[in-house]
Each structure stands twice: as structure tokens, then as C-alpha cells.
Swiss-Prot record:
<keyword id="KW-0997">Cell inner membrane</keyword>
<keyword id="KW-0812">Transmembrane</keyword>
<keyword id="KW-1278">Translocase</keyword>
<dbReference type="InterPro" id="IPR050133">
    <property type="entry name" value="NqrDE/RnfAE_oxidrdctase"/>
</dbReference>
<comment type="function">
    <text>NQR complex catalyzes the reduction of ubiquinone-1 to ubiquinol by two successive reactions, coupled with the transport of Na(+) ions from the cytoplasm to the periplasm. NqrA to NqrE are probably involved in the second step, the conversion of ubisemiquinone to ubiquinol.</text>
</comment>
<feature type="transmembrane region" description="Helical">
    <location>
        <begin position="11"/>
        <end position="31"/>
    </location>
</feature>
<feature type="transmembrane region" description="Helical">
    <location>
        <begin position="35"/>
        <end position="55"/>
    </location>
</feature>
<comment type="similarity">
    <text>Belongs to the NqrDE/RnfAE family.</text>
</comment>
<dbReference type="InterPro" id="IPR003667">
    <property type="entry name" value="NqrDE/RnfAE"/>
</dbReference>
<keyword id="KW-0739">Sodium transport</keyword>
<keyword id="KW-1133">Transmembrane helix</keyword>
<keyword id="KW-0915">Sodium</keyword>
<dbReference type="GO" id="GO:0006814">
    <property type="term" value="P:sodium ion transport"/>
</dbReference>
<keyword id="KW-0830">Ubiquinone</keyword>
<keyword id="KW-1003">Cell membrane</keyword>
<dbReference type="GO" id="GO:0009276">
    <property type="term" value="C:Gram-negative-bacterium-type cell wall"/>
</dbReference>
<feature type="transmembrane region" description="Helical">
    <location>
        <begin position="82"/>
        <end position="102"/>
    </location>
</feature>
Length: 203
């Protein structure tokens, strides 16, 4: 249990997708203007990461990797791990499509607010990175579930904090040359420096 808790904390704070690895920054900067929209997208990312990382773990273990379980049962040794990227993106696209249909039907206001950025979750590098890190680190199915939740929560936390800061900055006297994305990049950098303080924690 302690191992899973350590993995969860590590994936949220120490290895934060947005502020440690700088993944998913296009969506991170574009949707962090309002805190309500940021929380909505952050929740969507948590759901997608929580589902896709363990699903892709099963896909990798049972089908893709060298001497996978399926091929062992068939008595052949096949390595189709080179299809990993296409397979992972396919799983992510399917999950995002289901989520998009769900939001369109049950939460239309959030669906309209997210607009084009919801289908763009499919090609959000932070989402794909979750599955790639899972394979690289050879996580078990249980570890994949924990890592999926943690990496999604970490990204959602980062975008929610950024949105809160940007809403406050509307009332700040920002220099003319730094208005808009200029001050946003500086803020993201300062937040990343803050998250660097977690890197000294040994778990």
C-alpha cells in the first residue's frame, strides 16, 4: 500500500506532467484563462488518463510486447511492440470519443466551453506520455492504475492553479510588452520552479 501511495504522490508532484516534463503545454496555456473551464478539462484529462494507462498496459502485456501472454498461449513468439504508438493512440482516441459523447449529452455547457480542446486531448502529448512512461518503467496493471490517476490529477492541479493565477492577473498592472502569453509563460516558469522543490523528496 505504501508503494502505491508513494507512486501516486510522485506522479502528482515530483513528476508533474505539465510542470516537470512540460507535456501538454499547448492545451495547458490555451484553456487556463478561466478556472471553471480549466477544472472541466482537468477532470476530463483525469478520466482519460485513469482509463487509458491501465487499458494500454493490458494491451501491451497481452498482445504487443515480446512473448506476450496471447502469443504464449498460441505457442508462437511474436514481438509487435513496434505497433505500440498506433495502438495506444487508438485506445486514447476511443476513450476520448466516448467521453465527448457523454459530455455532449449530459453536460452540454462544459462541452461547449471546451470546444475544440476536448477532441485535442486525443493528441495531447501528456496523455500519450502516460502510456509510454508506463511501458518504459514496466509498471504492473495495479501500478498503471495508480500512475494513470496520479498523472491525470497532477496535470489537472497544474492547469487549475494556472487558471486561478491568470484570473487574478486580470486585475494586475502587467507591462504592455508582457500582456497575454508573455506573462503566462513567466508564470508557468515560476510555477515549475516551485514544483522543482518536490524533486528533493525521496520516496
Amino acid at each position: 500500500m505504501e508503494h502505491y501511495l508513494s507512486l501516486l504522490i510522485k506522479s502528482i508532484f515530483i513528476e508533474n506532467m505539465a510542470l516537470s516534463f512540460f507535456l501538454g503545454m499547448c492545451t495547458f496555456l490555451a484553456v487556463s484563462k478561466k478556472i471553471s473551464t480549466a477544472i472541466g478539462l482537468g477532470t476530463a484529462v483525469i478520466v482519460v488518463q485513469t482509463l487509458t494507462v491501465p487499458l494500454n498496459n493490458l494491451l501491451y502485456v497481452y498482445l504487443l510486447k515480446d512473448n506476450a501472454i496471447l502469443w504464449q498461449h498460441l505457442g508462437v513468439n511474436v514481438d509487435i511492440s513496434f505497433l505500440g504508438l498506433i495502438a495506444y493512440i487508438g485506445v486514447i482516441a476511443a476513450v476520448v470519443q466516448i467521453l465527448e459523447m457523454f459530455l455532449d449529452k449530459y453536460v452540454p455547457a462544459l462541452y461547449s466551453a471546451l470546444g475544440i480542446f476536448l477532441p485535442l486531448i486525443t493528441v495531447n502529448c501528456a496523455i500519450l506520455a502516460g502510456s509510454l512512461f508506463m511501458v518504459e518503467r514496466n509498471y504492473t496493471f495495479q501500478e498503471s492504475m495508480v500512475y494513470g490517476v496520479g498523472s491525470g490529477v497532477g496535470w489537472a492541479l497544474a492547469i487549475a492553479v494556472m487558471a486561478g493565477v491568470r484570473e487574478k492577473m486580470r486585475y494586475a498592472d502587467v507591462p504592455k510588452g508582457l500582456e497575454g502569453l508573455g506573462i503566462t509563460f513567466i508564470t508557468a516558469g515560476l510555477m515549475a520552479i516551485g514544483f522543482m522543490s518536490f524533486s528533493g523528496i525521496q520516496l
